[in-house]
């Protein structure tokens, strides 16, 4: 029986860290890989690559824990989140705080194997990961903070590989923020009615009936910035083909969200994984050739 309880607790931790739902980690991973490949240029040193891949999964898990901790009093009132480990009592608040600290310490131990510039930048990464979940109480733009949190691995990657943060780094960081606002607005459209009832703020609420148009504008801006990054770094035609495919995926997402159906909006959000993957493949093939 004791073993069963332990197994149940581990399963609850597993759900709290969202290791059963990798989409968030993938949306964090792709921009990290973009940055590593552009900074190298090409295949980065294998240890640095391993540190960042492991760091992505650890910090995404930590972000999910602190997000659920921040939302623990709200999640019970939302149908989609009512059964999460914290509001359902499967994990205590103390256990969640302890798990967050363990994950952050493990991630920081990995960062300590890198250069000083990267270590210093990692402090901002922790601050963004902690602050983001609480922003939805105070501003309609928490998605901007999410974009900064998900994108902070970009300057860290450039710093780790080249000990510099050039213009391409910050353009990529900006592109990631715009992309995150677009895809997380799609995600927020799923919960918009519930969020309005409990007082949670989001860009989906802020944009209102202009949500689809603004998402489209953001997506076009992302593609334009990626083209500029390609030009600055002398990338080959393979990369520009990937930008075109990403544009087609964005068009497909626009089709999905046209009626603002919850399931379709969530499907559009998930589709962004392929956008990140396609752009990474374009970068990798461009440097390979």
Curated annotation (Swiss-Prot):
Cite the CDD domains for this sequence: PT_UbiA_COQ2
Write out the entry's keywords from A to Z: Cell inner membrane, Cell membrane, Magnesium, Membrane, Transferase, Transmembrane, Transmembrane helix, Ubiquinone biosynthesis
Where does this polypeptide localize?
Cell inner membrane
One Pfam family here: UbiA
The protein's annotated catalytic reaction(s) are: all-trans-octaprenyl diphosphate + 4-hydroxybenzoate = 4-hydroxy-3-(all-trans-octaprenyl)benzoate + diphosphate
Q: Name one GO biological process term.
A: ubiquinone biosynthetic process
Chief location: membrane
Q: Its biological function?
A: Catalyzes the prenylation of para-hydroxybenzoate (PHB) with an all-trans polyprenyl group. Mediates the second step in the final reaction sequence of ubiquinone-8 (UQ-8) biosynthesis, which is the condensation of the polyisoprenoid side chain with PHB, generating the first membrane-bound Q intermediate 3-octaprenyl-4-hydroxybenzoate.
Pathway as given in its UniProt record: Cofactor biosynthesis; ubiquinone biosynthesis
The EC number of this protein is: 2.5.1.39
Q: Which cofactor does it need?
A: Mg(2+)
Give the Gene Ontology MF terms in alphabetical order: 4-hydroxybenzoate polyprenyltransferase activity
Q: What is this protein called?
A: 4-hydroxybenzoate octaprenyltransferase
Q: How does it sit in the membrane?
A: Multi-pass membrane protein
Ranges that cross the membrane: 33-53, 99-119, 141-161, 163-183, 213-233, 238-258, 268-288
Family, as annotated: Belongs to the UbiA prenyltransferase family.
Taxonomic path: Bacteria, Pseudomonadati, Pseudomonadota, Gammaproteobacteria, Enterobacterales
Task: Tell me the InterPro entries matching this sequence.
Answer: HB_polyprenyltransferase-like (IPR006370), Prenyltransferase (IPR039653), UbiA_prenyltransferase (IPR000537), UbiA_prenylTrfase_CS (IPR030470), UbiA_sf (IPR044878)
Q: Which GO terms describe its cellular component?
A: plasma membrane
* Organism domain of life: Bacteria
Q: Does the keyword Magnesium apply?
A: yes
